[in-house]
Amino acid sequence: ESYAIVVQKGIKEESVEQPIEALDASGDLAIGTEVTNNSTFRLTLNELYYTAKPSYKTGNVTYSYGIGDYHLVCKLDYTNLDTQALRTWDTSRIKDLKLTFAGEYTYDGVLWIPESKIVPLASGYAFLIFEVPRNIEDSTDPLMLTFSVDGSVFTVNCR
């Protein structure tokens, strides 16, 4: 099996592949980073944003997830290469969602999939949602997000 992180900067032709030694190896993600585990998933960190009313709109339908009052949202483009569907709120495959602020305050996150599931070989959005105090957005203190997908652990520097 081979695993790779593809980082793209600038024009499409400029890409760098960096192999991951093992499935449980850690990886740092940045906006636009694509990670592939050839047997179970491919994901790209699409965007990070703050919102008071988290929702996702497709066509005429708006999906809302109403926990707390202010959130940091991590949006992933996710391709399910596994034989089982990835379902909304499923914590068996995408799990251990943690957000650490200033190196000492930890917030747990939840997984949300607006289409209710991502069937095998299909792509969709997966949202990692963290309820946070409003002052985190404007702070300059470190903000690190960690999560795991099928045993691979990923870290995102949110600043």
What are these regions (language model features)?
Residues 1-159:
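Conserved functional micro-motifs across diverse proteins
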